[in-house]
């Protein structure tokens, strides 16, 4: 099994329709919202720090995940529209996709939020180091680590630190 993480830019992949159908069958509407927002231009994951990635297994789209500016928290980014096909779960694809997005975020900020839609998603995000923090529309926070020799540290003035409870 070969896993390839690709940046999605100019257009959504054709296979997104299959992903959306599978998500809808599971009761999830966030992939349909991704398609709708993309088609009308509301969200193309093209602002500073934003990114949309597709996870491909042996050339087939297995999942998708994005990072957008977190509007409820100054300087933070938010994981969005994250979905892995049910048949592809448990193979490390979601973890690889999430870690690629977190690695990207390190150049832009020190806090990433996510809204875990169910208990399984909450366990997944917590396994990556996200901490429960249910406010401002998100359920979890992740504090990214910067090192003093990290060139991204110069971006810290634009970011926030997690608030105390």
Predicted regions mapped to residue ranges:
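Hydrophobic adenine-recognition pocket in adenosine-nucleotide-binding enzymes
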Residues: 82-84
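Conserved acetyl-CoA pyrophosphate-binding loop and the N-cap/start of the following alpha-helix
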Residues: 87-100
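Conserved acetyl-CoA-binding loop of GNAT-fold acetyltransferases
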Residues: 126-136
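Conserved N-terminal entry element of GNAT/NAT acetyltransferase domains
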Residues: 1-14, 18, 147-165
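Conserved beta-strand-loop-alpha-helix junction that forms the acyl-donor binding cleft
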Residues: 89, 112-123, 138-141, 145
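Acetyl-CoA-dependent GNAT
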Residues: 3-75, 80, 104
